[in-house]
Amino acid sequence: MRSYLDFEKPVAELEAKLEELRALGARDGAVAISDDVSRLESKAAAALAELYATLTPWQKTQVARHPQRPHFVDYCAGLIEEFTPLAGDRSFGEDEAVVGGFGRFRGRPVCVIGQEKGATTEARIRHNFGMARPEGYRKAVRLMELAGRFGLPVLTFVDTAGAYPGIEAEERGQAEAIARSTEACLALGTPNVALVIGEGGSGGAIALATANRVLMLEHAIYSVISPEGAASILWRDAGRAQDAATAMKITAQDLLRLGVIDGIVPEPTGGAHREPEAAIRAAGDALAEALTGLADLDADALREQRAQKFLEIGRRL
């Protein structure tokens, strides 16, 4: 069953009427309703397109968090052949908030790493809602070092509200683990491309997104803190999250204009959750194009391009 966001209520009502008409036609084939169905389909599609063409930053935040939005495991299943996952950080344990391994992307061997939120209650608990602990980032470092050793490109998929802030994570060196993961990204001698597929929250996101090319899905968000967190700090009122989302410039469109990201991957009308397969194909095309654009750079040039890219962001902003 499709899940609707609050601001999608007008579309939800139209699509509910459409389903009623279709059910009526299925029950009684003698009832001529094809014209009514076509008319209502066109009206619902137009309403959806108009709504999604003018989303506010807060509405985009809601879309980025949509429970039916495709997650990393969906992109991995749709894009990576012969995927072989690796587990553990060889130091403390396994963190399923970060999933990674090796496989083939459109015929070429790659290392792929992503943050997984989980699609069911059980999966969300197992993956800790995509909030990685230190061992998750250390696993990512291990994977990136292996990729560098074997000369493989690295694809990272970012989808997290932020790194896990629990006491045990801090005791095991959360800040250091994030820093080491960021350092590993910068030190890679092979191309790396990051794609923000949902939420890109704080250091938990940048630890996997310090890449030669950083892309975002059309309705993804990328920020140093959640809108609710920013509103609580700035105005002592989490209820002003909508104001914070607008002020923070967290959308793909704002960040492309500011030079923080390198490209936007278009989503199907109504968001990636409405047509996951189409969204995954579009993401694959964008990743392939980015890798092709980096193919002629040697290890030193890749490191230099990456470093200058992020230094320039600091100078400009």
From Swiss-Prot:
The keyword Membrane does not apply. Residues 39-293 form the CoA carboxyltransferase C-terminal domain. It catalyses: N(6)-carboxybiotinyl-L-lysyl-[protein] + acetyl-CoA = N(6)-biotinyl-L-lysyl-[protein] + malonyl-CoA. Pfam families: ACCA. It is an enzyme of class 2 (transferase). One of its GO terms (molecular function) is carboxyl- or carbamoyltransferase activity. The gene is accA. Keywords: ATP-binding, Cytoplasm, Fatty acid biosynthesis, Fatty acid metabolism, Lipid biosynthesis, Lipid metabolism, Nucleotide-binding, Transferase. It comes from Methylobacterium nodulans (strain LMG 21967 / CNCM I-2342 / ORS 2060). InterPro entries: Acetyl_CoA_COase_a_su, ClpP/crotonase-like_dom_sf, COA_CT_C. This is Acetyl-coenzyme A carboxylase carboxyl transferase subunit alpha. Its EC number is 2.1.3.15. The keyword Ligase does not apply. Its main location: cytoplasm. Belongs to the AccA family. GO terms for biological process: fatty acid biosynthetic process; malonyl-CoA biosynthetic process. GO terms for cellular component: acetyl-CoA carboxylase complex. It is found in: Cytoplasm. It comes from the Bacteria. Coiled coil: none annotated. Pathway: Lipid metabolism; malonyl-CoA biosynthesis; malonyl-CoA from acetyl-CoA: step 1/1. Component of the acetyl coenzyme A carboxylase (ACC) complex. First, biotin carboxylase catalyzes the carboxylation of biotin on its carrier protein (BCCP) and then the CO(2) group is transferred by the carboxyltransferase to acetyl-CoA to form malonyl-CoA. Acetyl-CoA carboxylase is a heterohexamer composed of biotin carboxyl carrier protein (AccB), biotin carboxylase (AccC) and two subunits each of ACCase subunit alpha (AccA) and ACCase subunit beta (AccD).
